[in-house]
Regions:
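Zinc-dependent deaminase catalytic domain
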Residues: 1-221
């Protein structure tokens, strides 16, 4: 898990894939960590099969977008039978969940980089607003992450973990008594859910420009 020293540095290090969600967390505006969403094992395997076929086309000086569907399916079946799918997480994981899952690790990174410094500000930047069990789109029902029991929907997970300060239990001495916390999102994932509060809110125009220029303009299809 790499530590970046600015938002622009963190954004520049990643090329977002199509339909991929990124979550960037900042401690004190000094340390930034990036987390990606990932599909389930089967989808990850077929995506890798597609990528291999595209590379093969490129080496033969053929159109990388015109992948032979039959050959790709045969390669996918071979990869599945060879156990390639076992290399990937079996279930789809949202970026917010991966952030919570790796929270203990990034605290260790922060302490190593900034010894004797307490965390007083946490900001999270999302490419898309969190999924919600109250919305019309699919949401994550995964409830157990790092021995924490968290409710369905990433909006409730973030609230339970951060707003209720359960994150402090991982290393109580590392945080100030009062920590400023804010979550910004760039795009609205589910139009049926509106976030307009001090905890989760749409990014302001300047921040949206930074996120769009850095992440949306370089989406890898």
């Amino acid at each position: 898990m790499k530590l970046y020293h600015s938002l622009s540095e963190a954004i520049a290090a990643f090329q977002r894939k199509s339909r991929e969600v990124l979550a960037i967390i900042s401690f004190n505006g000094q340390a930034y960590f990036v987390f990606r969403s990932n599909p389930n094992a089967q989808i990850s395997t077929i995506m890798q099969a597609h990528a291999k076929m595209a590379i093969g086309n490129e080496l033969r000086h053929c159109d990388t977008k015109k992948v032979d569907v039959v050959r790709k399916q045969k390669l996918y079946n071979f990869m599945m039978n060879s156990g390639v799918s076992q290399q990937f997480p079996q279930n789809a994981q949202h970026a917010e969940e991966n952030l919570i899952r790796n929270f203990p690790n990034i605290l260790k990174k922060f302490k190593a980089e900034f010894p004797n410094q307490k965390i007083n500000t946490i900001e999270i930047f999302l490419t898309h607003s969190p999924c919600s069990s109250k919305g019309k789109k699919k949401y994550s029902a995964q409830c157990h992450i790092n021995n924490f029991f968290l409710p369905p929907g990433c909006d409730k997970k973030l609230a339970a973990f951060f707003k209720k300060e359960n994150y402090k239990s991982i290393d109580k001495q590392l945080f100030d008594k009062k920590v400023k916390l804010r979550i910004h999102y760039n795009h609205q994932f589910d139009p049926s859910i509106e976030y307009n509060n001090h905890f989760i809110r749409e990014a302001d125009p300047i921040l949206k420009t930074v996120l769009c220029d850095g992440l949306d303009s370089r989406v890898k299809h």
